[in-house]
Amino acid sequence: LVSAGKEVDVVLGAQTKDALVAREAYTAVLGREPYCATDDGTYGYHGFCTGVVNELLQTKPYDLVACCGPEPMMKSLCDITSAKNIPTAISLEKRMACGIGACLSCVVATTEGFKRSCVDGPVFDAAKVVW
């Protein structure tokens, strides 16, 4: 997206500053530091990354939000973006046993029925995921 000239904001969240991953890599790609949140307040916003996202969404319009991480956090983020009618793509971290859709160990409940994360995902439209 950045190489295509799109404006991109990245929000990273972790329990502590030491647990933040890829901060330098995102800085190199973005040309500026990503937004960061730490649960303990040791770096950036003191609290969850959803707090940062909520603040950002109040400052300017967004065409899309993409999210990965723990499902409870993604659910919370999707509640925020859904209330603002912002399309949201989520990457679900499901265990994939076979990787070809045969074993059904990675199914995700959606408004269109069950989808296999390994074949149909792992990125899904958050509005279609049944939490």
Task: List where the protein language model places each region.
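Local cysteine-cluster metal-coordination motifs and their immediate loop/turn environment
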Residues: 71, 93-122
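FNR/FR-type flavoprotein reductase catalytic core
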Residues: 1-90
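Short microdomains enriched in Cys/His and/or Lys/Arg
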Residues: 119-131
